């Protein structure tokens, strides 16, 4: 999507991959059910179907990455994105120390099939790192994502 930084795309892709269990680039109803249940939620079949219909804008029965991005932008715009932001941060913060380090970012990018130089990783961190400590804390992540939401929604 236009206006997204590399960091924002990484965060969204990582979240998408959590849902896309078989790695085919699409989220099926079954994958949506599995992930929501793994988060401790127990949606009914009707609730799952409603969620799928809300996101699956082209009606083909699966959620692709663009539809997923649209959902995230909508959720953030609706003001209920705080929980989603927290979850996305936790996905990227592999060691759960409250920071996204260059090593964690490199690991995520590698898992997404992106080979990055140390300089590219450092640049991504620098763009979001407002306090200059060399890593991204949750507050910096929230600012970065809110800025992305404004760019997405215009």
UniProtKB/Swiss-Prot annotation:
Which residues are involved in binding Ca(2+) 2? 56, 58, 60, 67
Q: Which residues does the record give as Ca(2+) 1 binding sites?
A: 20, 22, 24, 26, 31
Query: What residues does Ca(2+) 4 bind to?
Result: 129, 131, 133, 135, 140
SUPFAM superfamilies referenced in this protein's UniProt entry, alphabetically: EF-hand (SSF47473)
Domain called EF-hand: residue spans: 7-42, 43-78, 80-115, 116-151
Which GO MF terms does the UniProt record name? Answer: calcium ion binding; enzyme regulator activity
Q: Which UniProt keywords apply?
A: Calcium, Metal-binding, Methylation, Repeat
For the ligand (Ca(2+) 3), the binding residues are 93, 95, 97, 104
Which PANTHER family does the record cross-reference, listed alphabetically?
CALMODULIN LIKE 3 (PTHR23048:SF0), MYOSIN LIGHT CHAIN 1, 3 (PTHR23048)
Function, as annotated, reads: Potential calcium sensor.
This one is known as Calmodulin-like protein 4
Query: Which gene is this protein's source?
Result: CML4
